[in-house]
Every structure is written in C-alpha cells, then in structure tokens.
Amino acid sequence: MPPQKYHCNVCAQDITRSIHIRCVECVDFDLCIPCFTSGASLGTHHPSHPYRIIETNSYPIFDENWGADEELLLIDACETLGLGNWADIADYVGNARTKEECRDHYLKTYIESDCYPLASVELPGPVDRIAFAARKRARIEAFQPPPIIPQKPLASTPQCHEIQGYMPGRLEFDQEYMNEAELPIKDMNFDDDLHESAKHEMQLKLTMLNIYNSRLTRRAVRKQTIFNHNLLDYRRLQANEKRMSKEERNLLNKTKAFARLLTGPDYQKFVNSYHEQITLKKQISDLQEWRQMGLTTLEQGHKYERDKTQKFLLSKASASYDKQLRHVKSFNQTTSAPFQVRDIQKIVPRKPATPTMFSASADRQLLSEDEQALCSKLQIFPKPFLALKFALISASLTSKKPFQKTDAVNLFKHLDANKVEQVYDFFHNARWIGAPT
C-alpha cells in the first residue's frame, strides 16, 4: 500500500515530497508554488483565501540518518500494514530504505528507548541539513539499479540469411516451426450467411483458426527460447563447445531439452550445478576406492590414479604390439623375404617430434615430470615412450642375467642407439631396470 500522495489541484503536479500551499477554507485543496504565486483559482477557491505552508519535514528528530517525514511514514506503515511486515513497510517508506533498516530503526528508536513507549528526542548534536540531504541523495542514487545497456541489434547481413536463415528486421526465419501452418486457412473467408448449414461451416472455420493460433503460440515459444538463450550467435556457441571436454559436451547435450523451461541465466546455473554434482559424485567414488585400497592421503590417491592409467595404457600397448607381431609373422609366411619394422621406417619416414607438438600431446599427463622432461629432450611422444618403457622393464624382468645397456641397444636395433641408451640410463637411475646394487 503506497503512502498518500498530494497533487496540485490546478496543474495536477505531484507535490508529495516538496513544499506546497494548502488552503484553510477549501477542503483538501493544495497548490504548488508556481500556481500559488500566479494567483490561480479553481471552483470555490480564491487567491484571497488564507493558507498554510506545508513542508516536507525532512529534518532528523530521533536519528541523524532518518528524517521526520520518514518517521511519520514508518509509524503510519506499521499501523496500517502491521508489525513484522517489514518488506511492505520498507516499500511504503521509500527513500531506498531496506526492510532491515526499517526493522532495526523501529526497534532501536521506539522499543529500546529509555522513554518507552515514547521515542527519545535527544540527538547527540546538531545535524547539518546539507550533509543530511547529501547522504540521502547518495543513498537513493546507490539504490537505483544501473541502466541496462541495450544490446547491439543484429544486422541483416548475408550471414543471417544464408547460414542462419534469420531476418532481424522481421524477427522471422526462412523456415519457421510448422512452416505450413498457414496453408489450411490461406483461402478461408467469412460470409454473412446465417443459415443453419452456414453455422456448422462457421464452427469448422473457427476450430481451424483455434488450431492455427495454437501453432502460432508454439512457434512463438520456440522463437522466444532462441532469443532468450542467444542461439543465433552460433559461432560463439561452437567456440565454447570446442573448449569443453567430451564429458562436458555430453552433459550439455543431455540438458539442452530443459532450455525451453528456463531463462538463459537459470539454464546456465542449472548446467553448472549439474556438472558440479557429477564431479562431486566422481570424487566421492574415487575417495571410496582409495579408502578400500588403503590410501589415506590425496597424494597417494593421485599417484594411484596415475599408476592405474599407465598400467592400462601399457596393457593396451602390449596387446596392440602382440597383434602387430602376429600380423607380421603371418605376412612373412606368405612372402619370400622377411618383413621387419625398419622396412616401414624406410618407406614412411617419421617427422621428428618438436617440443610444441609434445606439449600439445593428449597423453602427456600420463607421465611424471621427469619423464616429460626426458621425452621433450629426446623428442619422443608419450605413447611410444610408454611402449618402450613396457618393453625394457619386461625384458629386464625376464632376463636370466643382469640386463645391461648393450642388451637394450641390441633389443631395439631399429631405434636410435643414443636415445635407447639415455632411456636406459633414466630407468637404471630410477632403479627400474639393470643389475641390482
């Protein structure tokens, strides 16, 4: 319920919060200052009537930050709207007052007063009216929301017509939803014939129009969804999806059906919350697995995950190597000359890996920091390095004598001996292969 407003009876200007004139003889007759000084009259009112000057009473009396007019509005609102309804009371008082401010001021000034049930009228000192007005103005300006900057309208460019099929000036698409909805009614007309047979025909036509209106409603809903979620900016959406991981893209595709039910910000909040829920479930599952394995710290858990991933990749590389070996053996049985791996290298030379290519490799996180530094130095990709690691460790474990550096070089004759020696030294220093010390 808004507070009572006062308007000039001559020009109808709002004079609620400004100084105005009230006629003593006429009932509820108020004048603004310009109409009063010009001697305006209306009805039974005459400029010679006695008058009173009505001020806004914005000077503080109980609190240095609350004016007398706000005190009157607060008491009036509490009496009219009821104590405890502080949200409506704050709207009634206005002047950018919040419900917390109204509640705290009422309790402090009237309930906790030393003169209860009266309010204490003793101010700590004189109040500067100019400073009080400046604080009030700053509070009102800070309460007002910032102006909404209108978005730049889409230009009717060839991109809109050829790629998106959208015409911004008409807010239409080349192919609308249910594009043939207008065909059943395009030749419909209404006659003035009111015979009994014409009434049934009229009812049929009205039913067809209702069906057409329902289709227009569904079309408008889908179009509004496109505008609310800014789906016309497909390049930005594609760029955002490319930066997502595979799991995030799958999650986004699953939740796109809910976009029609939510606004743009609410839908984005829903997607983020859903993704956070899945992430937390995955973390809980990992923690439960770590606890079952006897791990008690996060560092042990991360090391366990790295080792598990490396074990999986090594087993996968071993299976692939066995498959290729069987293929080579079957190929040698059908040819006169044996086929070896170095023959492939002669036919299709490999381009050496660069540090930039290695840093962009998808399997780089499967290696430790020392292994990454070694691969970057020797220009070896992670997957070949893991296969080489598996082969060297397996050969060292199955060797009946201490596995020496020459054994590693002889095992990989088709590879660069210098690289094999450096990899052997790295594994030997890590105590993974070689003679025990």
From Swiss-Prot:
Keywords, in A-Z order: Chromatin regulator, DNA recombination, Meiosis, Metal-binding, Nucleus, Stress response, Transcription, Transcription regulation, Zinc, Zinc-finger
GO CC entries: nucleus; SAGA complex; SAGA-type complex
Binding annotation for Zn(2+) 2: 23, 26, 45, 49
SANT domain mapped to chain residues: 61-114
Domain of life: Eukaryota
SWIRM domain location: 347-437
Entry protein name: SAGA complex subunit Ada2
Originating organism: Schizosaccharomyces pombe (strain 972 / ATCC 24843) (Fission yeast)
Gene that produces this protein: ada2
